[in-house]
Amino acid sequence: MNHFELFGLPNQFELDGGLLSLQFRELQKRFHPDNFATSSERDRLLSIQKAAQINDAYQTLKNPVSRAEYILSEQGHDIRGEQTTMQDPMFLMQQMELREELESLPSSSDPESALFDFAENVTAMRKSQLVQLQELLKNEAWIEAAQSVRKLKFIEKLNQEVEQLEEKLLG
């Protein structure tokens, strides 16, 4: 049983996050190890394994990047943990320029405002990449979808760096 089937969801990238959370809570209640405290050793172990499977599946599906990686792995294109280098020089150049811009923000005349604008740009890039990824997965363009996930990972990392700088500037 795959992660989508476990939660009774369609096997697709786009999903209802509210329904995922609802199903997660229901499954957690049903298979919580405390419910099997008086059961046989075998049943207790099975409930622990099932609870771990439910938690793992939920963590995978709630995050768009890990969800896309999971879908790709189910289609024979497992890119989780890969060390493949990005093959898109224009995208890499853009990422380098964005990181340079991010590094220069603290010394700008209004760092908070500049960071806010920069963060909005990164958020727009992320949304655009997610839309593209959704379309590629829907069309079963697995190779291109894998490349899109790699780009999304770069954007996610950049977003983390934005959040770190925000904490540094405001905290």
UniProtKB/Swiss-Prot annotation:
SMART domains: DnaJ
Protein name: Co-chaperone protein HscB homolog
Record has Chaperone as a keyword: yes
This protein's UniProt keywords: Chaperone
Domain J stretches: 2-74
A single GO cellular-component term on record: iron-sulfur cluster transfer complex
Known role: Co-chaperone involved in the maturation of iron-sulfur cluster-containing proteins. Seems to help targeting proteins to be folded toward HscA.
Family: Belongs to the HscB family.
InterPro entries: DnaJ_domain, HscB, HscB_C_sf, HscB_oligo_C, J_dom_sf
Any Pfam family hit: HSCB_C
GO molecular function: ATPase activator activity; protein-folding chaperone binding
Quaternary state and interactors: Interacts with HscA and stimulates its ATPase activity.
Domain of life of the source: Bacteria
GO biological process terms, semicolon-separated: [2Fe-2S] cluster assembly; protein complex oligomerization; protein folding
